[in-house]
Amino acid sequence: MTRRRDFGALRRLPSGRWQARFRLPTGERVTAPRTFPTKADAARWLSAAEVDRARGLWIDPRAGAVRLEEYAWAWLDSRVRLAPRTREIYESQLANHILPLVDNGLPPLGEVRLGDITSELVRAWYAALERSRSVSTAAKAYTRLRQILGQAVADDRLAKNPCRIDGGGTERHPEQRFANLQELYALAGAVPKRYRALVLTAGLAGLRQGELFALRRRDVDLLRATITVRRKRLRLASGEVIEDDPKSAAGRRVVALPRQLVAELDRHLSEYVLLGSDSYMFTSSTDSPLERSNFRMRVWYPATEAAGLEGLRFHDLRHTAGTLAARTGATTKELMARLGHASPRAAMVYQHAAEDRDRLIADRLDLMAEESGLAAVVPLSGRTRKASGDTHQR
C-alpha cells in the first residue's frame, strides 16, 4: 500500500516493514538504502532527505553503497604523487590495520559500505585496534581512515565524515631518548673507525639515516664547514633501492658543522672515501653503499652494547643533535632549518628537552641586573630574625 505525501512516498511491504522513496527532478526514483520497522521511522528519513535536498546537503544513498575496501584502494591509486616509501606505508596500513578483521565482535571494516560506516563503528574499531595492536598504530590507522573518508565526503559519497574521535590521530610516543656528548663520543669510539664520522655527523649535525647514506663527497664542504643535504637513500620492502628528494622540501638544506666534526670528516675523506665528487661518503668495508639492516646488526647493536647504551636507536642520534642545538639557545625556526623539519611541532620537542636551560636563563637575568647596578633583594633566610619573644612593632 502506497501513501501519498507532498514529498516522496511511503509504502508498507509484505514483510511489514516500511519503505521510503522519492523522485529527483530528472524523474529518477531514489529509494532509501534500508527499510524501516515503523511508518514514523520511514517518514523521518524522508523528511530528513527533503531538508537536506533543500539545503544542498543531500547525498544519493547509492553513492555510499561502495565497500570501503574498493573505495580505499581506488583512493590510494589516485595518489600519484606519493613517494614510494609513503605508498608502502599506506598499503601496509590498509592491508593490516584498516580493512581486515581486528575484533571478532566487529565486521571487517573493508567489507562495510561507505554509507554504513557510523561514528559508533569507527570508535569501536579504533578501541579494538588500540587493544590488539598499539596506541601508536591505532592513531596512524585512524589518521589514514579519516583521510580516506574525508575524500568520500568531497566526492559526495558521504554527507559527513564519521571519523570524529577527539584526538584520535594524536600519537603518544614514549619519551624520546638521546645521548649526551660523552655517550655520543663513547659510541663513536665503539664502532669500527670507518663509521666514527658517521656516528658523529648523526649526533652533531642531525641528519637522518637515509640522508647520511646518500651523502656524496661533493656534498661536504670542509672550507665552509657545511654539509648540503640533497637526497635520501633507502631500500623499500620490495627490495628496490631508491634515491630521491628528502622527506620534505624543508629537508633540502645546508647544515653548518662544528670545528671538531670538520676535523673528523677531513680524516674520514682521506682514509675511507673514494676519489670522485660523486663517491659515497659512508660505505661498507667493501666500499659499497650502506644498508640499514646490515649496519644495524653488524655495527650499531655491538657498539651500543659495548658503550653500555643498549636500546638506543640510531635515529636517537638525531634527537641528540636536536637537543644539543636547543641547548645552545637555538630558536624553533633555527631548529627547523637545521634538522629539516617542515613544521614547528617536531622542532619544539627538542626545546622541551632542553628545559634545563631555564636555570641558565634565570642566572643570566641575575647577572644582567647586577651589571645594571640593581641591588638584589636579600632572601628571608639571609636576614637577621628577631627572637620569638620580641615584640613586633607596627
Regions found by a protein language model. Give the residues of each.
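C-terminal secondary-structure termini that scaffold catalytic or DNA-interacting sites
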Residues: 1, 189, 224, 233-261, ...
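Short, Arg/Lys-rich segments that mark the N-terminal edge of DNA/RNA- and chromatin-recognition modules
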Residues: 1-37, 85
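Short beta-strand motif preference
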Residues: 18-23, 42, 227-229, 257
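A short, charged, amphipathic alpha-helix used as a generic interaction element across diverse proteins
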Residues: 37-53
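Basic/aromatic-enriched alpha-helical hairpins
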Residues: 48-57, 69-134, 148-151, 308
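Short, basic (Lys/Arg/His-rich) helix/loop patches that form interaction surfaces
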Residues: 104, 186-196, 205, 255, ...
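Basic, Lys/Arg- and aromatic-enriched nucleic-acid-binding interface segment
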Residues: 135-143, 154-215, 223, 234-235, ...
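Short, polar N-cap/turn motifs at the start of nucleic acid-interacting alpha helices
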Residues: 219-226, 311, 330-349, 374, ...
